[in-house]
Regions:
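Secretory targeting signals
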Residues: 27-38, 69-118, 142-208, 212, ...
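Residues that define the loop-to-transmembrane-helix transition and helix capping
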Residues: 65, 139, 212-214
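Aromatic- and glycine-rich beta-strand/loop motifs that create alpha-glucan
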Residues: 26-67
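Terminal transmembrane helical anchor/hairpin motif
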Residues: 2-20, 24-26, 81-94, 208, ...
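Helix-loop-helix units of permease transmembrane domains in multi-pass membrane transporters
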Residues: 51, 117-150, 299
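Helix-capping/transition residues at the boundaries of transmembrane alpha-helices
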Residues: 56-57, 120, 131-133, 202, ...
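Membrane-interacting alpha-helical segments
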Residues: 44-48, 52-59, 140, 182, ...
Length: 303
């Protein structure tokens, strides 16, 4: 008599322990439809893309036109001064236009105009979502946008500042040396230091207050305008004071005009540390705020 043994059919509900591959199998078989873990490294190419988009966006629009008009004023004033001042004194014109008008007014105003819209423009144009869904940490997105804003502001400011310097010393014996070969690089460094601090300050301010332009204008007038000119300890909390100390030490500007006594003023290294620390701290707090904040992004339907 023959005994027939039935062949067992596969269970419709397999054992989960048998269905799930072990970690070793996942590593050995990465191409068999098993999801691979995402890398936690920051993509430099993705960050560079954010920087390029920010530069392209900040390089157009009414802000750029306003910046061009504002920075044309020192050039026009320099031309008029050369025409009507008798005798013409280029050193005094440099102090009034470069260290006075540009550094005390135009640089902080230009930083405010661009940094205040650094994030808000993406919200208004409904493009912030495209940044947030990319595989980039939020803090890296903010720092990339901050870098792009600084590049745009600094490049425009440097072009007009050097143009003003050339206009002031045009036709003078020292135009090439020492003006363009010695003084101009120092002025470029001071512009970069000033804007790095101002862009970081106003970039963070745009995340902390609603009316950034109003509060930024108040800061410029009160702190960088009034407090920086008062011979009291509070002026050491301003960007303008440390920039002026560097200008007095590096450019031999007359410190008496700003009540700066080099025997009691901070050393150049101290001023550099203060300016770089301000830039770093405000950039870090801005990145932290951007990383934790929930944004109400507008949609085409208005929701």
């Amino acid at each position: 008599m023959t005994t027939i043994v039935p062949t067992p059919s596969p269970s419709p509900h397999p054992d989960p322990a048998q269905a799930v591959a072990s970690p070793d199998e996942i590593v050995r078989n990465p191409i068999e439809g098993v999801p691979m873990p995402l890398s936690h490294r920051v993509s430099l190419s993705a960050i560079w893309t954010v920087v390029r988009i920010t530069v392209a966006r900040q390089g157009r629009g009414i802000r750029l036109l306003i910046l061009a008009v504002l920075f044309s004023l020192p050039i026009v004033i320099a031309v008029l001064t050369r025409r009507f001042q008798d005798p013409y004194q280029p050193e005094s014109a440099e102090g009034a236009l470069i260290l006075g008008l540009i550094f005390q007014a135009l640089l902080p105003v230009s930083a405010l105009l661009f940094a205040s819209g650094m994030v808000q423009d993406d919200i208004e144009e409904q493009t912030l979502t495209y940044f947030l869904i990319r595989p980039i940490p939020r803090w890296a997105i903010y720092l990339a946008k901050l870098l792009g804003t600084f590049v745009v502001t600094a490049m425009r400011a440097l072009v007009f500042t050097i143009a003003t310097l050339v206009t002031i010393y045009w036709g003078e014996d020292g135009l090439i040396k020492p003006v363009l070969t010695e003084r101009a690089p120092i002025i470029v460094a001071l512009v970069a230091l000033s804007l790095s601090a101002y862009v970081a300050i106003f970039g963070g301010l745009s995340l902390w207050v609603r009316r950034t332009l109003v509060f930024g204008a108040i800061y410029i007038v009160v702190f960088e305008g009034v407090f920086a000119n008062i011979d009291f300890v509070i002026r050491e909390a301003t960007v303008m004071y440390h920039v002026r100390v560097l200008a007095v030490r590096w450019l031999d500007m007359p410190g008496a005009d700003w009540s700066i006594d080099l025997s009691t003023a901070p050393a150049a290294s101290t001023c550099l540390i203060v300016l770089l620390t301000v830039s770093t701290v405000f950039a870090a707090f801005g990145a932290l705020t951007f990383g934790m904040r929930e944004f109400r992004v507008k949609t085409p339907e208005g929701s």
